[in-house]
């Protein structure tokens, strides 16, 4: 065990070196070699592929309903690539509703539950009711840059970028929205609207944590000069913001380097975890795919918090299992898409998918969702943003079963040394 502990400490030191190398501008391939060595382990408990559904259009986000009986998927209607004008097609996105069957598979209930949405991305479920929004209301990130029109042209008009949080119930009824775009409270606080409102998570008190990846603002004339970071929206402010009023307890912003993407609150330590996606867009990310842990005090005092891992590529979705094991989706296109696993206090390992072969190839895994059921097993739903082909309506969502012993497997040595 002493040898194992030395190896773990050495790896932690190497992570710090990795960030330092990146900061000094050494070639990306040097960082990648170091990162691959640091994160070469696999999680001891493989996941089983239950289903690959081909029924979507660039699925970006997934969320379980409050009762766990349904899954909602955001179809982002992405077009193009980074090299040729990547963007979200105005008004082409929609939300799909699926039922969770007894065997863990999903079946389509309503393919187009809510339509006409621009850039529907991450979602979260409100745990504590307000006067306006019942507990169980789903909040959706939508309206973000980068935007393209139906002809594939980049949108230059600043007025057409209307980022917001859209609230709806399980039946697909829209209950309200919170404006995060031009003229909103968020622009007044930060000098810029939220440009790429990407993901959100709730804490047990109903406060919302929202990431702004701040990508795409330069397409407008004049451009938006946004900042990537994390917003905390107090539960007490939700109704006022939805009604267009100034809340007595306003949102708070913390700048985070590297274009933050996924965000979720740990069910065990209550901290807010944020990952970074900057490497996906060829942008500067000092962590080269990092994960930060922030307390509420960090946010209140405008502190970045602690970086707990780095060198993971370009991270998109982030979620926790029931016992606090963290999962991240690696979406960067020039290295394999995968799900990484962080046991508490440990560096990331890779989640192995069984059976192997073509079914295990993840094409742009994005905003994932996980939920535990009565038998102890957990379902992991993975939207695959880049699972494109020439025909509409058949992009992929993969459903995995994490066995009942998945979380307790963290007590075993992830490198297989004991």
Model regions: which residues?
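Bacterial N-terminal signal peptides that target proteins for export
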Residues: 2-17
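A short helix->beta-strand "capping" segment at the edge of beta-propeller domains
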Residues: 36-56
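Beta-strand-rich domains and repeat architectures in extracellular enzymes and scaffolds
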Residues: 51-84, 89-91
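Beta-rich, blade/repeat-based domains predominating
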Residues: 55-68, 92, 114-146, 182-208, ...
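Short glycine/acidic-enriched loop and turn motifs that connect beta-strands
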Residues: 77-82, 144-149, 215-218, 279-282, ...
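A short loop-to-beta-strand structural motif that recurs across blades of beta-propeller domains
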Residues: 84-87, 91-96, 163-166, 228-231, ...
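Short loop/turn segments immediately following beta-strands, especially the blade-tip
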Residues: 98-104, 172, 234-242, 294-300, ...
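Blade-level signature of beta-propeller repeat domains, shared across WD40, Kelch, NHL, RCC1
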Residues: 369-418
């Amino acid at each position: 065990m002493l040898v194992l502990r030395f190896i773990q400490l050495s790896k932690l030191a190497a992570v710090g070196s990795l960030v330092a190398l990146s900061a000094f501008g050494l070639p990306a391939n040097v960082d990648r070699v170091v990162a691959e060595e640091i994160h070469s382990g696999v999680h001891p408990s493989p996941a089983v592929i239950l289903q690959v559904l081909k029924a979507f259009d660039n699925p970006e986000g997934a969320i379980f309903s409050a009762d766990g009986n349904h899954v909602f998927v955001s179809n982002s209607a992405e077009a193009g690539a980074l090299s040729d004008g990547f963007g979200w097609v105005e008004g082409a996105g929609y939300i799909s509703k699926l039922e969770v069957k007894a065997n863990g598979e999903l079946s389509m209930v309503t393919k187009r539950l809510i339509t006409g949405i621009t850039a529907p991305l991450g979602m979260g479920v409100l745990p504590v009711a307000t006067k306006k929004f019942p507990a169980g209301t789903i909040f959706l990130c939508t309206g973000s840059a980068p935007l393209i029109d139906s002809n594939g042209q980049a949108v230059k008009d600043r007025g057409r970028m209307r980022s917001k949080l859209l609230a709806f119930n399980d039946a697909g009824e829209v209950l309200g929205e919170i404006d995060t775009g031009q003229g909103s409270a968020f622009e007044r606080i930060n000098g810029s609207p939220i440009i790429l409102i990407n993901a959100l998570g709730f804490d047990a008190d109903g406060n919302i944590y929202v990431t702004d990846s701040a990508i795409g603002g330069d397409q407008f004339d004049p451009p938006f000069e946004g900042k990537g970071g994390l917003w905390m929206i107090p539960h007490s402010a939700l109704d006022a913001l939805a009604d267009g009023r100034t809340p007595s307890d306003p949102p708070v912003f913390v700048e985070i380097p590297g274009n933050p993407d996924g965000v979720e609150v740990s069910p065990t330590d209550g901290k807010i975890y944020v990952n970074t996606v900057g490497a996906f867009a060829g942008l500067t990310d000092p962590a080269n795919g990092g994960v930060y842990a922030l307390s509420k005090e960090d946010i209140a005092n405008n502190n970045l918090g602690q970086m707990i891992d780095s060198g993971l590529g370009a991270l998109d979705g982030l979620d926790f299992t029931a016992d606090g094991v963290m999962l991240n989706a690696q979406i960067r296109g020039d290295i394999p898409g995968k799900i990484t696993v962080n046991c508490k206090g440990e560096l990331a390992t890779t989640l192995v998918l069984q059976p192997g072969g073509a079914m295990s190839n993840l094409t742009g895994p994005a905003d994932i969702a996980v939920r535990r059921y009565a038998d102890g097993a957990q379902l992991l739903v993975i939207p695959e943003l880049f699972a494109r082909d020439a025909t509409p309506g058949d992009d992929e969502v993969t459903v995995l079963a994490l066995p009942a012993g998945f979380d307790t497997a963290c007590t075993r040595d992830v490198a297989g040394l004991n």
